[in-house]
Design a protein with these regions (language model features):
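Long beta-strand-rich cores associated with HINT superfamily self-processing modules
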Residues: 160, 168-173, 177, 181, ...
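Short, surface-exposed secondary-structure boundary micro-motifs
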Residues: 217-218
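Short, structured beta-strand/loop micro-motifs enriched in basic residues and often containing a Trp
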Residues: 188-199
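Helix-rich terminal scaffold detector
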Residues: 1-122, 134-142, 155-161, 167, ...
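Short, compositionally biased
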Residues: 223-232
Length: 232
């Protein structure tokens, strides 16, 4: 029995760390979350998501978040003559931990996508214990036009990579900020240094191809300075 309790305790602690990181990620992207949601204690996590025998229940680990006013402003295209009141390119996000511990196939992904689409979620993040099958990944690609779906492994969320002392602060630029940057330095976007969309930081921020991120570093000699990268 002790061995079983110890296994449950380790799994619960791992899931709690992933739960905290995914909340920090969603908050850092600009969604509204209460401080107590982001900084939930391990005891509160156990009370909310563990069964009577101490085992964690991934099926209860889910939440949604709405974009903040600043996020809506950043993701709203500038008005044009043909579209004087453009809609923002963001909306409510749905996050869910997949209860399946085996292979994540088409049926699991279709169910998740249908839930997001039916409930009008603009984006969805599925956190899984194991990697997706190639067929499940194809479902994500097909649905990207109307619901942006992302997947993260639990093990990749045990530590928030942006909290590492060697990782500089990354800030997504709005369309207007990107255009102003290119105009100021008389550059084409293809002349900017690049960051791959599969880069861990790009995935953390949910960067899309064509977006520009500002990287703020501090140097003992140069002080605080910024560089820019285009997501490709």
């Amino acid at each position: 029995m002790e061995g079983s309790d110890n296994i449950h305790s380790k799994e619960t602690t791992r899931l709690w760390r992933a739960w905290r990181t995914i909340h920090e990620m969603v908050s850092d992207r600009g969604y509204e979350l209460a401080e107590e949601e982001i900084k939930m204690s391990l005891d509160d996590f156990r009370a909310k998501f563990c069964n009577g025998d101490g085992s964690p229940d991934r099926g209860r680990m889910q939440f949604s978040a709405r974009p903040s006013e600043s996020m809506i402003k950043k993701f709203t295209p500038p008005p044009t003559a043909s579209n004087p009141d453009p809609a923002p390119d963001c909306g409510t996000i749905w996050v869910e931990f997949c209860p399946e511990k085996g292979s994540i196939g088409i049926n699991v992904m279709k169910k998740f996508v249908e839930h997001c689409a039916t409930n009008n979620f603009k984006a969805g993040i599925l956190v899984t214990a194991v990697a997706l099958s190639s067929q499940a990944r194809k479902v994500m690609t097909v649905t990207s036009q109307y619901t942006l779906i992302e997947c993260f492994l639990e093990e990749d969320l045990l530590v928030n990579i942006t909290h590492h002392e060697l990782v500089p602060k990354h800030v997504l630029l709005s369309r207007d900020e990107k255009n102003a940057l290119l105009k100021r330095y008389r550059l084409k976007e293809t002349q900017l240094p690049r960051i791959l969309s599969k880069d861990p930081i790009a995935r953390y921020l949910g960067l899309k191809r064509g977006q520009v991120v500002k990287i703020i570093r501090t140097s003992e000699t140069a002080g605080r300075y910024a560089s820019y990268r285009l997501c490709v």
